[in-house]
Curated annotation (Swiss-Prot):
<keyword id="KW-0249">Electron transport</keyword>
<dbReference type="InterPro" id="IPR038876">
    <property type="entry name" value="ENOX"/>
</dbReference>
<protein>
    <recommendedName>
        <fullName>Ecto-NOX disulfide-thiol exchanger 2</fullName>
        <ecNumber>1.-.-.-</ecNumber>
    </recommendedName>
</protein>
<keyword id="KW-0560">Oxidoreductase</keyword>
<keyword id="KW-1003">Cell membrane</keyword>
<dbReference type="InterPro" id="IPR035979">
    <property type="entry name" value="RBD_domain_sf"/>
</dbReference>
<dbReference type="GO" id="GO:0022900">
    <property type="term" value="P:electron transport chain"/>
</dbReference>
<comment type="function">
    <text>May be involved in cell growth. Probably acts as a terminal oxidase of plasma electron transport from cytosolic NAD(P)H via hydroquinones to acceptors at the cell surface. Hydroquinone oxidase activity alternates with a protein disulfide-thiol interchange/oxidoreductase activity which may control physical membrane displacements associated with vesicle budding or cell enlargement. The activities oscillate with a period length of 22 minutes and play a role in control of the ultradian cellular biological clock.</text>
</comment>
<dbReference type="GO" id="GO:0005576">
    <property type="term" value="C:extracellular region"/>
</dbReference>
<keyword id="KW-0341">Growth regulation</keyword>
<keyword id="KW-0813">Transport</keyword>
<dbReference type="InterPro" id="IPR000504">
    <property type="entry name" value="RRM_dom"/>
</dbReference>
<keyword id="KW-0186">Copper</keyword>
<dbReference type="Pfam" id="PF23267">
    <property type="entry name" value="ENOX1"/>
</dbReference>
<feature type="domain" description="RRM">
    <location>
        <begin position="99"/>
        <end position="178"/>
    </location>
</feature>
<dbReference type="Pfam" id="PF00076">
    <property type="entry name" value="RRM_1"/>
</dbReference>
<dbReference type="InterPro" id="IPR056611">
    <property type="entry name" value="ENOX1/2_dom"/>
</dbReference>
Length: 598
């Protein structure tokens, strides 16, 4: 029975006879043109093993779109597609290397010839195992052919034009497990692993450095050739390796010793050349370092200029005219430029530190300031003691050497000279002991002088700090006294009560004593304070006029200082420390506490 492919009415009648709903729309061809030479619908593209997805027949279709399959005509049967609205048939998990499929739902009257006729379109069939219960197993030649066979799952098969139940069936195609497939797949995997190992081995052998050529055995002819190569700079490395191998093999003997010596001498002549080359390379390295440092300095200067531009743009005069986005970009750029500048600056400073470390101590010494007369005298004394100490140590070593020589001569001399040499030895030992004692005394004196020198340095530092504080206090007190002099005059009694400081001199004294007691938190006696003031007075050529005598200039007295400090109760406080004979009066600075009380 032959039906025109393009006649929709004829196909609708045939499908009604089978009890199936007609597919397609009236007035349109249900099936595309069929090419009998292909044995399949022309709408299906040709299948090749090189297609992606192991040669799956249908192209990728969106999951929400139903698959419309075509009717397939064979010589003895016809395959009708399933309803496209039904879900696709379920399949089991694909075994590795699967080439065998399970085909169920065959017609009862179906033969092996019909099965071959239907599935030979999917590919070459190796074997068919048919069962009596309407199913069979088909083994294909390649794995991609299994995917073609799965495409026929769900089709209705009809033998000829019969509508008998034994001549119809619904095909169910699924993956099947077969030991032959698994064995072939394992063999293939092992073959691929062998190929991969071989490829890696070849790659490793290719990357491996070539083995050195074998060294020839020693002979007079080869010795002359190596001697000539040793004189050539380009062939020196090869020749010296040969020479080293010969010496390690034990080729040196009496007959060949002169030849080997001449070759070693030739190798030694290259030392000066290598030293000159090293010096040349070092010079080039220094020049490259200098160029790099100069280039880095230029880059750093440009970075500084860029950062300065950003900072000037960030000032309010120009900043207010930029938009918000422009300000954000300028801030980000400025931050990035500062980070890069800091990195370059650290690198440049590291180079400079390395250069400074290479310099000798004499080049990095700086000239110190001139010391005071007492300090310079102590330094000169310490240097003199050090020189004397060194000279005594050298004399001591000389005496020890003489003693050793005398001991050696004493064993060789005759016995008749023994009394004289023993006496001389005793004298030398006594002189040695005296020198050792003198050396110990000099060392102790040297240590004392050094300790005294350190103490004087510390005192000088403290005095300099106090002088600075004194000048600051003097300026502050002078400004305050000028401001107070502009106020109206008040009675003498009220002035004495409200202002305990009577003159500018006393104000300066108060400032100096406050500074002194501030650095002595545990207080100081009145004698200690006056001695400090007198010493400071001698240093600064400054004296306080006494209000009790008619002499204009007198040294600072204890009573004046104590009366001044007694009037300032919120600034100075007197405390008693100790018990019994160790009882002592100490003055402390309490100016900050007085601020809270006032």
């Amino acid at each position: 029975m032959t039906l025109p492919v393009s006649d929709p009415a004829a196909w609708a009648t045939a499908m009604n006879n089978l009890g199936m709903a007609p597919l397609g729309i009236a007035g349109q061809p249900i099936l595309p043109d069929f090419d009998p030479a292909l044995g399949m619908m022309t709408g299906i593209p040709p299948i090749t093993p090189m297609m992606p997805g192991l040669g799956i027949v249908p192209p990728p279709i969106p999951p929400d779109m139903p698959v419309a399959k075509e009717i397939i005509h064979c010589k003895s049967c016809t395959l009708f597609p399933p309803n496209p609205n039904l879900p696709p048939p379920a399949t089991r998990e694909r075994p590795p290397g699967c080439k065998t499929v399970f085909v169920g739902g065959l017609p009862e009257n179906g033969t092996e010839q019909i099965i071959v006729e239907v599935f030979e379109q999917c590919g070459e069939i190796i074997a068919i195992r048919k069962s009596k219960k309407n199913f069979c197993h088909i083994r294909f030649a390649e794995e991609y052919m299994v995917d073609k066979a799965l495409y026929l799952s769900g089709y209705r098969i009809r033998l000829g034009s019969s509508t008998d139940k034994k001549d119809t069936g619904r095909l169910h195609v699924d993956f099947a497990q077969a030991r032959d497939d698994l064995y072939e797949w394992e063999c293939k995997q092992r073959m691929l692993a062998r190929e991969e190992r071989h490829r890696r081995r070849m790659e490793e052998e290719r990357m491996r450095p070539p083995s050195p050529p074998p060294v020839v055995h020693y002979s007079d002819h080869e010795c002359s050739i190596v001697a000539e190569k040793l004189k050539d700079d380009s062939k020196f490395s090869e020749a010296v390796q040969t020479l080293l191998t010969w010496i390690e093999r034990g080729e040196v003997n009496r007959r060949s010793a002169n030849h080997f010596y001449s070759m070693i001498q030739s190798a030694n002549s290259h030392v000066r050349r290598l030293v000159n080359e090293k010096a040349t390379h070092e010079k080039e390295m220094e020049e490259a370092k200098e160029k790099f440092k100069q280039a880095l300095s230029g880059i750093l200067i440009q970075f500084e200029q860029i950062v300065a531009v950003y900072h000037s743009a960030s000032k309010q005069k120009a900043w207010d005219h930029f938009t918000k986005a422009q300000r954000k970009n300028i801030s980000v750029w400025c931050k990035q430029a500062e980070e890069i500048r800091n990195i370059h600056n650290d690198e440049l400073m590291g180079i400079r530190r390395e250069e400074e470390m290479e310099m000798s101590d004499d080049e990095i010494e700086e000239t110190t300031e001139t010391k005071e007369t007492e300090e310079s005298a102590l330094v000169s004394q310490a240097e003199a003691l050090k020189e004397e100490n060194d000279s005594l140590r050298w004399q001591l070593d000389a005496y020890r050497n003489e003693v050793e020589l005398l001991k050696q001569e004493q064993g060789k001399a005759h016995r008749e000279d023994d009394p004289n040499k023993e006496q001389q030895l005793k004298l030398l030992q006594q002189a040695l002991q005296g020198m050792q004692q003198h050396l110990l005394k000099v060392q102790e004196e040297y240590k004392k002088k050094e300790a005294e020198l350190d103490r004087i340095k510390d005192d000088n530092l403290q005095v300099e700090q106090l002088l600075e504080n004194f000048h600051e206090k003097q300026e502050n007190c002078g400004s305050r006294l000028c401001a107070s002099s502009q106020e109206g005059e008040q009675p003498l009694e009220k002035t004495a009560v409200s202002n305990p400081v009577k003159s500018e001199r006393e104000a300066l004294l108060v400032g100096i004593i406050s500074t002194f007691l501030h650095v002595h938190p545990f207080g100081a006696s009145i004698e200690y304070i006056c001695s400090y003031l007198n010493r400071l007075d001698n240093k600064a050529s400054y004296q306080i006029p006494s209000k009790l005598t008619t002499s204009p200039l007198l040294p600072i007295s204890t009573s004046d200082v104590e009366s001044l400090m007694s009037r300032l109760q919120h600034t100075f406080r007197q405390e008693m420390t100790g018990v019994g004979a160790s009882l002592e009066k100490r003055w402390k600075f309490c100016g900050f506490e007085g601020l809270k009380l006032t």
